Amino acid sequence: SRSSCERLRVGCVIVSSGEQKNRIIAAGYNGFLPGAPHHSRVRDGHEQATVHAEQNAICDAARRGVSLEGATVYVTHFPCINCAKILSASGIRCIKYHSDYRNDELAKEILAESQVVLLKL
């Protein structure tokens, strides 16, 4: 991952569905906002100045006008609850992750209720 985070490097790739299935349509990694200083701001034990890999990947698609409807996400770590919600809301239908990381049962429930398939690789 290209992440500059010292604690955990996370990467995310989103691939298409349909006729152009499995083509990369967006990607992101966790890190500081573009153009912002790489200055850590921790509150309640969590970094506040960075954007999660999944969020950056969705922003990448949005900047380029790419629909994520029906797409699949490959991410290095189990998504946090906020990323799970925005991945579902953006039209993602499948999340495949490599490593367990603070797996939240509520995130699993929310994804299941919104018919998003969650698979550990």
Predicted ranges, named:
Residues 1-121:
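Zinc-dependent deaminase catalytic domain
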